[in-house]
Amino acid sequence: MNMKPATAKISSVALKHNIQTIKQKAPQSKIIAVVKANAYGHGVVFVSAAVEELVDCFGVARLEEALSLRSNGITKPILLLEGFFCDKDLPVIAINNIQTVVHNVEQLEALKAAKVPNPIKVWLKIDTGMHRLGVALEDVEYFYQALRDSENVDPQIGFVSHFSRADELECDYTKLQLTRFLNATQNKAGEKSIAASGGILFWESSHLDWIRPGIIMYGISPINVPAQEYDLTPVMTLTSSLIAIKQHKKGEPVGYGGIWVSDKDTKIGVVAIGYGDGYPRDIPTGTPVYLNGRRVPIVGRVSMDMLTVDLGAEAQDKVGDEVILWGKELPIEEIADISGVISYELITKLTPRVLTEYID
């Protein structure tokens, strides 16, 4: 008997392929590889080491993420996409060659007043319509001049913004955001970045000096269309094993609440993964998994540690056989569409109980 529990298999070959695809889509742009949230659940150290030679910078959300990269040998620049949270972080940022976004007056004043050993590279974040982080359009000039006047700031100031609807392929609001960004930064020295994954795929005019691939770097589409259509390869394959096969009678229910009742004699397979591993509890009956070259449907309610599938009466599957929950054989975008849980959330909500296997 040889059964493996829930395992996320992470492919460096797929990662590198996706970076090359991204470069082909935006050949004139430099790349900030977004590896926040443990590289979208893929393992930040493995991912960053795998692509460091292919990218120009890394993007993270927290200083702790940046310092983890530094302590694990990553030497490329790192950008704090939300900026710094505490005044005391600034000397650490300077010493470790970490760049920071500035998006509010509190950060600006802290930066001006800080005692740092060397100037810090700053990206001024502009709110062009996301209305989350960023300085107002009418305040860009003030912030820009204040940053230029500070000895604590590297004179090469960058400009950054973020689309709110780049995944809508025909959206005038995205065009408006780009126009606002270009107008706000015209006649100002400094490199510009507004395109994340949606912008890279669907809005070529937004590529500018830097692009910030996130979800597409991991071979997942920002819309519920399989990423393979954009020449992207899934980096993660989520697998588990059949741990039991049960003969099941017509008219008998399966699982908690008896919400599914078989209309025929069949075989039920029990798979060692559940919501305790991060697989969605509310996923509906009929959602496919991939087993021995075919799709079979989940039946009954997903429980904490297991789910059940209808193998069919004539199934030849065996205990220990590998089951794929998503990956190249079964696009995560399809699971996202069925479950109502976006792919970003599916991959980042996997729990520590899921083993990670780095391959290639």
Curated annotation (Swiss-Prot):
<feature type="active site" description="Proton acceptor; specific for L-alanine">
    <location>
        <position position="256"/>
    </location>
</feature>
<dbReference type="InterPro" id="IPR009006">
    <property type="entry name" value="Ala_racemase/Decarboxylase_C"/>
</dbReference>
<keyword id="KW-0413">Isomerase</keyword>
<dbReference type="GO" id="GO:0005829">
    <property type="term" value="C:cytosol"/>
</dbReference>
<dbReference type="InterPro" id="IPR020622">
    <property type="entry name" value="Ala_racemase_pyridoxalP-BS"/>
</dbReference>
<comment type="pathway">
    <text>Amino-acid biosynthesis; D-alanine biosynthesis; D-alanine from L-alanine: step 1/1.</text>
</comment>
<dbReference type="InterPro" id="IPR029066">
    <property type="entry name" value="PLP-binding_barrel"/>
</dbReference>
<comment type="function">
    <text>Catalyzes the interconversion of L-alanine and D-alanine. May also act on other amino acids.</text>
</comment>
<dbReference type="InterPro" id="IPR000821">
    <property type="entry name" value="Ala_racemase"/>
</dbReference>
<dbReference type="Pfam" id="PF00842">
    <property type="entry name" value="Ala_racemase_C"/>
</dbReference>
<feature type="modified residue" description="N6-(pyridoxal phosphate)lysine">
    <location>
        <position position="36"/>
    </location>
</feature>
<dbReference type="GO" id="GO:0030632">
    <property type="term" value="P:D-alanine biosynthetic process"/>
</dbReference>
<feature type="binding site">
    <location>
        <position position="304"/>
    </location>
    <ligand>
        <name>substrate</name>
    </ligand>
</feature>
<dbReference type="GO" id="GO:0030170">
    <property type="term" value="F:pyridoxal phosphate binding"/>
</dbReference>
<feature type="active site" description="Proton acceptor; specific for D-alanine">
    <location>
        <position position="36"/>
    </location>
</feature>
<comment type="similarity">
    <text>Belongs to the alanine racemase family.</text>
</comment>
<feature type="binding site">
    <location>
        <position position="132"/>
    </location>
    <ligand>
        <name>substrate</name>
    </ligand>
</feature>
<dbReference type="InterPro" id="IPR011079">
    <property type="entry name" value="Ala_racemase_C"/>
</dbReference>
<dbReference type="InterPro" id="IPR001608">
    <property type="entry name" value="Ala_racemase_N"/>
</dbReference>
<dbReference type="GO" id="GO:0008784">
    <property type="term" value="F:alanine racemase activity"/>
</dbReference>
<protein>
    <recommendedName>
        <fullName>Alanine racemase</fullName>
        <ecNumber>5.1.1.1</ecNumber>
    </recommendedName>
</protein>
<keyword id="KW-0663">Pyridoxal phosphate</keyword>
<dbReference type="Pfam" id="PF01168">
    <property type="entry name" value="Ala_racemase_N"/>
</dbReference>
